[in-house]
Amino acid sequence: MEKPRRKKRWGRRKVRWAVMGVCMVFVCISFVVSSIWSDTRRFSKEKGRKAQVSERTFGPAEKKRPETEKTAEPTTEPTRKPVDKTLQIYTYLQGPKSWNQGIDWSGEWGESYMDGGSFGGFGCGLCCMANIYSSLTPYQCSPVDMYRYAKKHTGYGGGMAIDWGYIRRGLTSLGLHCHVERKQETYHEFRENIRKSKCAIVLVSSANSTVHWKNTPGHYVTIFEFQEKTDKVFLADSGDPDHNRRWIHLKKVYRSLKTASNWQYLVISGYDKQKDHWHHKMANGTWNRPSYLKAKS
């Protein structure tokens, strides 16, 4: 009769190894958990330290700006260009050559005969009057308009150069304050008169000086915008397109004043609209109007 088999039991050695294995597993798990906890704690400490540094640097209420954010540059207004007053100064030309060449400010009147005389030969004074009236008042006229006005209101007969008396009488009736002058003994006195004026009509002659005008027995021109720093004036010369609308030194004008005439120049000191009996609104006739000249309302 067979004996019943006994169940095998683990030996002491095997139990010892099992216990050691369990302990090693527990130690490994503890090490891993400890490492993770340590890293987490160290990360939180570093984060807290950075926050403290940030607060010390930027203050508690100030947040550090992103690196990509740029400081807005201050806006600057564009510099405005100074207004060129000469663009609204009228500078009519009187002769036929200017008209045939199509030069700005020339007109058909350059080829016209009026009361037996060629306007291109005698119209310089009337161009000066038209320049002044159109430049200093809200109104405008052409040299032909001024010719007709002077004939009707001043006693000027037409067909020839206009004299100082008719020029002064005509401009006064248009509300312009003006008076005639003789050449002063010194340039300083002449300069002071021009400095205080709005503009002036001057009578020049190459018989007195050829510093600027050649072959010119007698010729009316207009001068505007005296510059105190340079002693220059803006010249309106109806007889020469190369002279017209140029800046020249006032001393050249002074030296060229025609002393053979009773009067050498006429100064304009102001304008009174209420004393203007004309209020002429159109520059009539066929002429080459510059593109830069603004239309008057």
What positions do the PLM features span?
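Mid-length scaffold segments of soluble, non-membrane domains
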Residues: 141, 148-183
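Active-site-adjacent substructure of cysteine-protease-like catalytic cores
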Residues: 183-234
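Noncatalytic regulatory segments and standalone regulatory/sensor domains
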Residues: 226-297
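Active-site-adjacent structural segments surrounding the nucleophilic cysteine of cysteine proteases
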Residues: 14-23, 28-157, 294-297
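N-terminal Lys/Arg-rich, disordered targeting/topogenic segments
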Residues: 1-15
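Stable alpha-helical elements in mature extracytoplasmic
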Residues: 120, 125-129, 142, 146, ...
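Extracytoplasmic/periplasmic, Sec-exported soluble proteins
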Residues: 116-125, 138, 158-163, 182, ...
